[in-house]
Amino acid sequence: ADELTYRTKALLSKANNKAEMDKILAQMQFLGSISTAQAETILNSLKSIWELPDYNKWLSSYSIISERDISVNGQLYRPDKIFYNEEETIIVDFKTGKKSSTHKKQVRNYIETIAKMGFPNPSGCLLYLSDIPELEFFK
């Protein structure tokens, strides 16, 4: 994966809504870490992800925890996003590059940990960042 894909992943992990996303992108441009053209490329990638029906629903109607460390029995976990309401919890991890079985294993560890913490009905979702973003759901 290229540098812009990694920046897109970082932005997705941090921003919980469009206003935050725009603010972070503007800061990145102001600091000179990305050009205007790169900002547009990232913005287009983010829009294609935020327009996915499931992701859009989570953003607009679920509580969100972003990149928070969770420590259980000396193990440290840091899911990219946790979307939750009274009925369900979706743990989303953003991935660059090729699919790997270790990705599911990582998110299954998150699911187990979140369940122990009392979050309702946890499930996992891998979001692969590519030209066409792809969500992969599992329990």
Please state what every model-predicted region is:
Residues 72-139:
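Nucleic-acid nuclease catalytic cores
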Residues 1-79, 83-86, 104, 127:
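Nuclease catalytic cores
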